[in-house]
C-alpha cells in the first residue's frame, strides 16, 4: 500500500514523503492515527501542487528579505540617551530600543530576535549591528548613539 505521510514518523520518514508499507500497518495505524493518507492519484497531485506553491512562496519571501537587507545596509538609526562621564551611557542600548528606533525612523519593523549581537553598546558614537533576517540573509545596521 502506498501512503503519503502527513506527519513525521520516526521509524518511517518525514511529512510529505510517499512510502510503501504493509496494508495492515498503513490502514490500521498510520491512516487511523492521522499520520498518513492513502496515496491516490488525486492526493499525490494535490501534494505536488502544494509543494509548488510553497516553493513559490519561499522564493518570494527570500526576494523580499534580500530587498530588506539592502535597505537596512544603507540605513542608519540615531538613538539618543543620557550620557555620564567620559561619554559612557547610563545603562546600555537594548534590542527593543534598536527595533523601536528602526520602526520610527525608517518604518521597518523587525523582530528583536533578528538582532544577533549581544548589544554591548555602552558608549556614544557609531556602531554596527549584525541582523540575521532568516534563510541565511544578513544585514548590517548602522547605529549612531548620541547624548542628550
UniProtKB/Swiss-Prot annotation:
GO terms for molecular function: rRNA binding; structural constituent of ribosome. Keywords: Ribonucleoprotein, Ribosomal protein, RNA-binding, rRNA-binding. One of its GO terms (biological process) is translation. The keyword RNA-binding applies. One of its GO terms (cellular component) is ribonucleoprotein complex. Coiled coil: none annotated. It comes from the Bacteria. HAMAP family: Ribosomal_bL9. Binds to the 23S rRNA. Belongs to the bacterial ribosomal protein bL9 family. This is Large ribosomal subunit protein bL9. It comes from Sulfurimonas denitrificans (strain ATCC 33889 / DSM 1251).
Amino acid at each position: 500500500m502506498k501512503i503519503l505521510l502527513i506527519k513525521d514518523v520516526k521509524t518511517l520518514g518525514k511529512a510529505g514523503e510517499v512510502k510503501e508499507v504493509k496494508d495492515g500497518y498503513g490502514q490500521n495505524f498510520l491512516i487511523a492515527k492521522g499520520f498518513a493518507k492513502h496515496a491516490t492519484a488525486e492526493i499525490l497531485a494535490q501534494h505536488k501542487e502544494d509543494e509548488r506553491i510553497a516553493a513559490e512562496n519561499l522564493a518570494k519571501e527570500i526576494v523580499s528579505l534580500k530587498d530588506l537587507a539592502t535597505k537596512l545596509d544603507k540605513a542608519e538609526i540615531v538613538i539618543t540617551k543620557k550620557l555620564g562621564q567620559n561619554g559612557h551611557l547610563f545603562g546600555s542600548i537594548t534590542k527593543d530600543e534598536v527595533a523601536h528606533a528602526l520602526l520610527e525612523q525608517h518604518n521597518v519593523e523587525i523582530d528583536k530576535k533578528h538582532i544577533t549581537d549581544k548589544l554591548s553598546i555602552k558608549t556614544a558614537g557609531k556602531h554596527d549591528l549584525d541582523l540575521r533576517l532568516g534563510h541565511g540573509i544578513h544585514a548590517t545596521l548602522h547605529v549612531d548613539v548620541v547624548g542628550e
